[in-house]
Amino acid sequence: MAEAAAAPISPWTMAATIQAMERKIESQAARLLSLEGRTGMAEKKLADCEKTAVEFGNQLEGKWAVLGTLLQEYGLLQRRLENVENLLRNRNFWILRLPPGSKGEAPKEWGKLDEWQKELYKHVMRGNYETLVSLDYAISKPEVLSQIEQGKEPCSWRRAGPKVPDVPVDPSPGSGPPVPAPDLLMQIKQEGELQLQEQQALGVEAWAAGQPDIGEEPWGLSQLDSGAGDVSTDAASGVHANFSTTIPPTSWQADLPPHHPSSACSDGTLKLSTAASTEADVKIVIKTEVQEEEVVATPVHPTDLEAHGTLFGPGQATRFFPSPVQEGAWESQGSSFPSQDPVLGLREPARPERDLGDPTPTVPQDETSPGDWLFGGVRWGWNFRCKPPAGLNPRTGPEGLPFSSSDNGEAVLDPGQAPRPFNDPCKYPGRTKGFGHKPGLKKHPAAPPGGRPFTCATCGKSFQLQVSLSAHQRSCGGQPDGVPGAAGSARDGSGLRCGECGRCFTRPAHLIRHRMLHTGERPFPCTECEKRFTERSKLIDHYRTHTGVRPFTCTVCGKSFIRKDHLRKHQRNHAAGAKPARGQPLPPLPAVPPDPFKSPAAKGPLAPTDLVTDWTCGLSVLGPTDGGDL
């Protein structure tokens, strides 16, 4: 036995035993870590439970407080109900007669009271209010009492209003305002119908007897006084003075049936109905006619006609507005109209005369101008909002003769002499460019007969305008010809000249970019590599080589590009019929691609987004998120 116990243990056995112990220790450590994690989670849940319990306790306390308040109010209501029941059961109630002011109305002579009288009245009203509240009388605090306590004067407009008689109501238990009794409503309705019939029968006879026959001819300028432009109003009655001869005052001061206002006839003029309205309605009609008279007395500039073209129809202004030929106001179009808005009455400075140099055609005296002169064409009298009459050419006029220009004899419509129908742009003789307004036409000269008369003495390049030649000479190194004081001035480009090579520039940014070539400065470094660039746009294009973003995609073959000019070059290859890249079949192209600008009828009206898409040929815009310029 001793020999067996003293036998040495082999090292392999020891190693196996140690490894087994290590594995056991590791498993125990893992269990310990898991227990620690579970303990932490349990502690966290316990803390959350405690927090929730505290919040629930706070909410419960608030609920208990609200419940206690409700119980107290319920006890008060129950006691008041018991008191009312005892009074009704014992018939121990009385009628309380209160002095004036108990219902919250202020005395009529409040402004004549002294301070001590007002203070006494305030105390009396407060005592009455407290007495009513102590007797369980459901009443709110009077508004007049609140105003008096705040030191304000009681509102007098409430006292001046008509008194509304008390109407018996049905004590319906449902919610909502009290509703008058049905029998009273029927009685009021029947009495109102009878009174209305009597007033109509009497009022029509009185009105027809005292008024002239105005149904045949509407109120026009012929029925007004000669001083149509002078507006005079009676301060007492508010009636226009010019209508004293047309409408006798005694005719409309009689009792007239109500609810019959003046009506507008189909021809655009105002007529009074036979069953006319009350005195206030007649005054309204007269004021309306005065406003129209003011419109007649004020001339309107032709450029302001389009804004007011919808007030009357094509033939409805003849009765209100005189013909300019008949009144002698048909002057040459070179004179400026005093611009005043007929509706708002806003005056603008007089427009200057035309300075285009073309002759101003005048209208012959035998040419009759149509009636709708104000809201139609200044020369021919048709409405701008509607189509011109049959046989009238908006480009030629009523006689069929176009207005000729002194430059080349081309028949055009002078935009300064008549408003432009259908939003046509102004065009100058010999030029294809159109302008939407007259100032742009003035700034754009006619095409010179020589083509390009302005030639640079340094390089021999020709230009159409002297301004273009001056800008070119600043970059070419020469001086503008024919400009007084050009040498040594600030416009000769001496301030934008490079000191290294002597080159001139028209903009400071171009000079700064040029100087970077001499100094070697590259202020835009790449954060991914060591390259630097002189322009931010080039740095953005370089970033796309790192990110792999190709925002410009060809709509024909689907190929993407980093730069926009690469896409344009690729699209030019498609347009020229070049073969596609290897492995990329080219889909069939349409024989004639539609042009939305030249053939809008083939494609229909385009939205602004469609026009932008067709114009850019599917180019996508590079935004700030993709690295584009802001």
UniProtKB/Swiss-Prot annotation:
Q: Which UniProt keywords apply?
A: Coiled coil, Cytoplasm, DNA-binding, Isopeptide bond, Metal-binding, Nucleus, Repeat, Repressor, Transcription, Transcription regulation, Ubl conjugation, Zinc, Zinc-finger
Q: Which InterPro entries match?
A: KRAB, KRAB_dom_sf, Znf_C2H2_sf, Znf_C2H2_type
Q: SUPFAM superfamilies, alphabetically?
A: beta-beta-alpha zinc fingers, KRAB domain (Kruppel-associated box)
Crosslinked positions (Glycyl lysine isopeptide (Lys-Gly) (interchain with G-Cter in SUMO2)): 283, 287
Q: Where is this region: Disordered?
A: 155-177, 326-372, 408-449, 568-605
* Comp. bias regions, Basic residues: 434-445
Q: Might you name a Gene Ontology BP term for this protein? A: protein homooligomerization
UniProt subcellular location: Cytoplasm; Nucleus
- Taking the record's annotation, the residue ranges forming a coiled coil are 16-92
Q: What is its main location?
A: cytoplasm
**What GO molecular-function term can you cite, just one?**
transcription cis-regulatory region binding
Q: Where are the zinc fingers (C2H2-type)?
A: 454-476, 496-518, 524-546, 552-575
Residue spans of biased composition, Pro residues class: 168-177, 585-597
Start and end residues of each KRAB domain: 96-167
Its post-translational modification remark reads:
Ubiquitinated by PRKN. 'Lys-48'-linked polyubiquitination by PRKN leads to degradation by the proteasome and may play a key role in regulation of neuron death.
Q: Where is the composition biased (Basic and acidic residues)?
A: 348-357
Instruction: Provide GO CC annotations from the record.
Output: cytoplasm; nucleus
Superkingdom, taxonomy of origin? Eukaryota
Query: Quaternary structure per UniProt?
Result: Interacts (via C2H2-type zinc fingers) with PRKN. Interacts with TRIM28.
**What's the stated role of this polypeptide?**
Transcription repressor that specifically binds to the 5'-TATTTT[T/G]-3' consensus sequence on promoters and repress transcription of PGC-1-alpha (PPARGC1A), thereby playing a role in regulation of neuron death.
Q: Which family does it belong to?
A: Belongs to the krueppel C2H2-type zinc-finger protein family.
- The name under which this protein is listed is Zinc finger protein 746
Q: Which organism is it from?
A: Bos taurus
What gene codes for this chain? ZNF746
